[in-house]
Design a protein with these regions (language model features):
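Active-site-adjacent core segments of small-molecule enzymes
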Residues: 2-5, 18-391
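Sec-dependent N-terminal signal peptides
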Residues: 6-11
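N-terminal signal peptide c-region/cleavage motif recognized by signal peptidases
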Residues: 14-16
């Protein structure tokens, strides 16, 4: 019982530490392996986060209101006498309740369940012949980045191992602005025209009458959308249940335009190839984990970074000239189609290393926004109708 109350007090201290606007920045607790060595692979760092925070922080004299004012107690309100009503002048009570009432935001319509991490992108190959993007201007250049991984259709709190595509959203903090590359773990998509997107998403949500998932609605839509077949075949293979977020690739899905310093332009597609390999769960394994550890993928990512086993991806691009695009037998701007690698081979660009966990999930991850229209000099949109709709 005593430990239960200690846990409640510690949780309140964590809340007040986040709320105090004049507080000092906490020391990071995410990377115990400062020398780059890998920690215990069997240790659940996510489950030990509160205990780790307690050991690395002195909780004395840090209980504050949202304006940074010291607070003597969060266990009792000001009252008129021992049994009297509470006082309207109790700023601490009102501040606490106001914060509680407003601390959440509406969940994302899609990609509501997700995990994220901070990292660094390093250029390994010269691609200035294709683009003048600041983050790619020279070999060895380093750019901070932020990646968010997610399922697509599930509501907040649902299992992150469900059979579903995985969102693979990237934000690069370049010297010429933030570049958002919003992709998936699969190289194609269900539809090619953005006007179909609202109807498609509705089929992934609850039936408006029964408030239950409805496979009939989904298959009605997909059966009338034959271009979705390439995506369906992937989602209903083991690719639809990757073993966590680290052991899967990422794809920009859409075609983009790259422009170099001379004003010359080519089309391109982005690929992120996992250095952790490609490991998937079987349907049985995914179903079991959804019931026993619905946050399995989030836990796996957090623990890997916490023990110093930093996940890495190699960025590669496919390049297509305007002349090649004009001679193709298919539409290269159709998000339901692949560019054949034998005709448009992968070109190495750089490597991403995720090396820091979020310190405040709501602040760092839940409030993170990714906008496909956030581009920087050197990259432009293509005629891809689905990409245009995202703008």
């Amino acid at each position: 019982m005593r430990s239960f109350f200690l846990l409640i007090i510690l949780s309140l201290l964590v809340y007040s530490s986040n709320a105090g606007s004049n507080r000092k920045k906490r020391a990071t607790t995410n990377s115990p392996s400062k020398g780059g060595s890998v920690g215990d692979a069997n240790k659940d760092y996510a489950a030990l986060q509160l205990d780790t925070w307690r050991k690395q922080n002195n909780p004395a004299n840090i209980l504050t209101a949202s304006n940074g004012m010291p607070v003597p107690s969060l266990t009792e309100s000001l009252t008129v006498g021992r049994r009297g009503p509470t006082l309207l002048q109790d700023f601490v009570l009102l501040d606490n309740l106001f914060h509680f009432d407003r601390e959440r935001i509406p969940e994302r319509v899609v990609h509501a369940v997700g995990a994220a991490a901070f990292g660094e992108f390093v250029v390994t190959n010269d691609v200035t012949q294709y683009t003048k993007m600041d983050m790619l201007k020279k070999v060895g250049q380093r750019t901070p980045c932020f990646f968010r991984f997610s399922t697509v259709g599930g509501r907040a709190g649902s299992a992150d191992v469900a059979r579903d595509p995985r969102g693979f959203a990237m934000k690069y903090y370049t010297d010429e602005g933030n570049f958002d590359l919003v992709g998936n773990n699969l190289p194609v998509f269900f539809i090619r025209d953005a006007i179909q997107f609202p109807a498609f998403v509705h089929t992934q949500k609850l039936n408006p009458v029964t408030n239950l998932g409805d496979a009939t609605a989904m298959w009605d839509f997909l059966s009338l959308t034959p271009e979705s077949m390439a995506m369906i075949m992937r989602v209903f293979s083991d690719l639809g249940t990757p073993d966590g977020f680290r052991k899967m690739d990422g794809f920009g899905v859409h075609a983009y335009v790259l422009e170099n310093a001379k004003g010359e332009r080519v089309y391109c597609k982005f690929h992120m190839i996992s250095r952790q390999g490609h490991v998937n769960l079987t349907a049985e394994q995914a179903t079991l984990l959804a019931g026993t550890d619905p946050g399995y993928s989030t836990r796996d990512l957090y623990n890997a970074i916490a023990r110093g086993d930093y996940p890495k991806w190699d960025m590669k691009i496919q390049v297509m000239t305007f002349d090649q695009a004009a001679k193709l037998s298919f539409n290269p701007f159709d998000a339901t189609k692949l560019w054949p690698e034998k005709n448009f081979p992968l070109i190495n660009v750089g490597t991403v290393t995720l090396n820091r966990n979020p310190e405040n999930y709501f602040q760092d991850v839940e409030q993170a926004a990714f906008d496909p229209a956030r581009m920087v000099p050197g990259i432009l949109p293509s005629p891809d109708k689905l990409l245009q709709g995202k703008f």
